[in-house]
A protein has these predicted regions:
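Short, surface-exposed ligand- or partner-binding patches at beta-edge/loop junctions that are enriched
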Residues: 66
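Rhodanese-like catalytic fold shared by cysteine-dependent sulfurtransferases
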Residues: 1-24, 30-62, 71-106
Length: 106
């Protein structure tokens, strides 16, 4: 495999992508974490059972990974790239950054 390609997105970029519908935010935290609270409009796809072939898709939306603080989301990028997918974006601050900024939680 070649070198890992990662693009860090910040809170404003994630909010913009969710608002304009251009982004599908894939939360790779565990189900109990997702159930306890998640970013509105994000979808759950836990890293513990991560299957790049089973990633959700939405017409016209790019996949961006998110986790608690930007560690597991980078691992998800690595797994996706190892599977041949050209996915490289993640929310660097993750759910902790979202909550700290006072954003709404689902």
């Amino acid at each position: 495999m070649g070198s890992l390609s990662v693009v860090d997105l910040d809170l404003d970029e994630v909010k913009r992508g969710l608002t304009d519908g251009s982004m599908l935010l894939v939360d790779v935290r565990e189900p109990h974490e997702f159930t306890a609270g998640h970013i509105p409009r994000s979808v759950s796809h836990p890293l513990s059972t991560f299957d790049p072939a089973a990633l959700p898709t939405a017409e016209g939306q790019r996949i961006v990974f998110s986790c608690a603080a930007g560690i597991r989301s980078v691992r998800a990028i690595a797994l996706a790239q190892e599977a041949g997918l050209a996915l490289r974006e993640h929310y660097r601050g993750g759910f902790k950054d979202w909550v700290a900024a006072g954003e709404p939680v689902a």
